[in-house]
Structure formats: structure tokens, C-alpha cells
């Protein structure tokens, strides 16, 4: 009797359940699943959906599809299985940051995006079982809106001292040896570990490039123990249903909310120090010039995920709500794009412009 092969989704669910039920289990035999055509094809589809620019080889999705997706993926599969796969150099692109400085994105070629995506599809199933609920960035079924909603919830539950944390060049400071150790706690497949090492070391001796599919997962793995430390603090400092400290992270954007009650005086400073102590062994530094502590009871605002948040009284003055507005630079950018669209519209019908 022929055994029906399981789908990629079923495989990921099985891996997740195993990881969830056995928190110290180290997985092996994963490389076979990474190199399966179904995994590579799904990784290609995800890369195609994002429709990024070509990498250093100049090859676009249109070029690949003209020559044939299956031959393209077969070539990747054969390189991986033969042990001769080598990532190409990334194409560097600079984009402006909100503060006027430039951020360097490193764009892998599509071939390498597919390999990273296949690796992510399998490893994500393991580490999703380990990740803390207070982490929201680049995770399945999680979004910036959920992170913002939880920050608002913390403020409404009287955690009114806000630590707006800025990490200094987080992705550039991730230490490869520490990241590999963290992954190896769950993975004992030498071929997978070799592939991870190839990907993260392709751009230098320290840091991981922003722009590849694997980087967000690696960044979450790196800070997961910090996330759980603050979840423990949240539980230990809670009094019944009332929490005194809450922590929210989206990639490298962190907010810590602390009770403004007089009995909790000094707790915010202790929370910030604890964060510094947790980050120091990882080589991650706080940007002390930009990390700020604000009191929303005094009408002070703070930024999170492109929004300015402020606590203001409601119309009847018998309560309050958290007001969110896109940051000024974001509003200016959107207005400029709308203006450009209108100016370039010419005599187009309104429905086409919309």
C-alpha cells in the first residue's frame, strides 16, 4: 500500500506540536525537508508574492519564469543536496530612515531568497513553539496592529510610565556564535547548521543582513530569552489581575510599560536596568540618546511602529483613551505620494486613479 505523502502544512504542524510538547528536543533530519521540491516551491511563491527587486545577478522573477520555474528550483535542489550550494553576495540598497539617516538593506538574489525561505519554513515551525507571546514582529498570524493594541491595553490598565527603547543598530550587532548556539539548542542536523552558517556569514563576521527572508526569524530567536525574562517579571509583579510591568517587542522596536502608582516608584528605572543587563551579554546596546522614559499622565507622547501615542481625557472628562496618530514624517510622505499621483493623473478617469 502506497503511503500518501504529507503536505508541507501538515509537516510544519507536526514539527510545531513536537517542539511544543518537548521543549528540549533537538530536531534532526530537517535538511531533507528543506530540500524537498514542495518546500522550495512554497519558498519561491512567498518570494514572488513580495516581488522584490533583483539581486546582484540581475535576474528577475520574469527572467526565471521565462526560462521555467521548475528547472530553476531543480537547480537549487541539486546544489543543496550535492553540498555545493554557496550564497552569492547581496546587493546593497540604502533607504532613508525617519531620522534622516540611511539604512542599508542587503538584497539577496532570488536563488538565495528561495533557499533562505525554505530554511525559514522549516525552522519557523520549531521556534514558533518557543517564542514568547509578547513578541509580534514577522511572525505568523501576528501584526503591528496587535502589538499597538497591546501597548494601548497596558496604558489603559494604568501602566503609565513608558520606556520607549531604541536599540543601537540591532541587526548589525548580532553575534554569529551566540545565534548559532541558540539555534543548536533545538537543531542537531549538521547540514542545516552548515546552511545557517553560510547564510549569516555571507556578509561578514558580525551582524545579519536586513532584506533576506531568514533575518527576521534569526532576530527573533536572538532576543527570545530576553522576551521570556520580561514575561516572568510581568507574572511575578502582577497583583491578582493587575499587572505592574509589561513588555512589547516588534522586531527591534521595544516598549516597556510600568505602573505609575506611587508604590511602584523606581520600578521603571529597574526595568530599564534589567533590560540593559539582559542585552549586554548578547552584544546588543541601547541607544541612550534615543531611549526615553515618558509619563503619559503628564500628556507626554512616545513613538511605536510609526505612530505617536498619547493618553488624553475623553469628552466627558470622566475617563481617558489612548490616541494614536501616524508620525509627522509618515503623514508628510503619504501626502507627497498622493500629490504626485494627482499631478501625474492627467485626464485619467477617477476610478482608474483610485
Predicted regions and their residues:
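Non-catalytic, polymerase-adjacent accessory regions of viral genome-replication enzymes
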Residues: 1-70
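Short, hydrophobic/aliphatic alpha-helical segments
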Residues: 35-45, 198-206, 292, 349-353
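Residues immediately flanking
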Residues: 56, 121, 165-167, 260, ...
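Conserved polymerase palm-domain catalytic core
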Residues: 72-75, 79-94, 98, 130-296, ...
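Conserved phosphate-binding loops in nucleotide/dinucleotide-binding enzymes
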Residues: 104-105, 109, 320
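Duplex nucleic acid-engaging cores and interfaces of nucleic-acid transaction enzymes
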Residues: 110-118, 346
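Electropositive, glycine- and tryptophan-enriched low-complexity nucleic-acid-binding patches
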Residues: 117, 121-134
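A conserved non-catalytic segment of reverse transcriptases
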Residues: 201, 282-353
Amino acid at each position: 500500500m502506497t503511503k500518501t505523502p504529507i503536505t508541507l502544512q501538515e509537516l510544519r504542524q507536526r514539527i510545531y506540536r513536537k517542539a511544543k510538547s518537548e521543549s528540549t528536543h533537538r530536531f534532526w533530519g530537517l535538511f531533507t525537508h528543506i530540500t524537498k521540491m514542495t518546500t522550495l516551491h512554497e519558498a519561491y511563491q512567498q518570494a514572488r508574492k513580495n516581488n522584490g527587486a533583483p539581486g546582484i545577478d540581475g535576474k528577475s522573477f520574469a527572467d526565471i519564469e521565462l526560462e521555467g520555474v521548475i528547472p530553476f528550483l531543480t537547480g537549487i535542489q541539486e546544489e543543496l543536496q550535492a553540498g555545493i550550494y554557496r550564497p552569492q553576495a547581496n546587493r546593497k540598497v540604502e533607504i532613508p530612515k525617519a531620522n534622516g539617516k540611511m539604512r542599508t538593506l542587503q538584497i539577496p538574489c532570488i536563488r538565495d531568497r528561495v533557499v533562505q525561505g525554505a530554511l525559514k519554513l522549516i525552522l519557523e515551525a520549531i521556534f514558533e513553539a518557543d517564542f514568547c507571546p509578547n513578541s509580534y514582529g514577522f511572525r505568523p498570524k501576528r501584526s503591528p496592529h496587535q502589538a499597538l493594541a497591546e501597548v494601548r491595553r497596558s496604558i489603559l490598565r494604568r501602566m503609565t510610565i513608558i520606556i520607549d527603547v531604541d536599540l543601537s543598530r540591532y541587526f548589525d550587532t548580532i553575534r554569529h556564535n551566540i545565534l548559532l548556539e541558540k539555534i543548536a539548542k533545538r537543531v542537531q542536523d549538521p547540514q542545516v547548521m552548515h546552511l545557517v552558517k553560510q547564510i549569516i556569514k555571507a556578509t561578514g563576521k558580525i551582524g545579519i543582513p536586513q532584506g533576506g527572508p531568514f533575518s527576521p526569524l534569526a532576530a527573533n530567536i536572538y532576543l527570545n530569552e530576553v522576551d521570556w525574562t520580561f514575561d516572568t517579571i510581568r507574572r511575578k509583579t502582577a497583583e491578582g489581575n493587575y499587572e505592574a510591568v509589561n513588555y512589547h517587542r516588534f522586531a527591534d522596536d521595544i516598549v516597556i510599560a510600568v505602573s505609575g502608582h506611587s508604590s511602584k516608584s523606581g520600578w521603571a528605572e529597574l526595568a530599564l536596568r534589567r533590560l540593559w543587563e539582559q542585552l549586554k551579554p548578547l552584544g546588543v546596546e541601547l541607544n541612550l540618546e534615543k531611549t526615553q522614559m515618558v509619563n503619559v499622565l503628564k500628556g507626554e507622547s512616545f513613538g511605536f511602529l510609526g505612530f505617536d501615542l498619547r493618553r488624553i481625557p475623553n469628552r466627558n472628562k470622566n475617563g481617558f483613551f489612548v490616541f494614536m496618530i501616524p508620525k509627522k514624517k509618515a503623514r508628510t510622505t503619504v501626502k507627497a505620494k498622493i500629490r504626485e499621483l494627482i499631478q501625474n493623473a492627467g485626464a485619467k478617469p477617477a476610478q482608474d486613479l483610485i
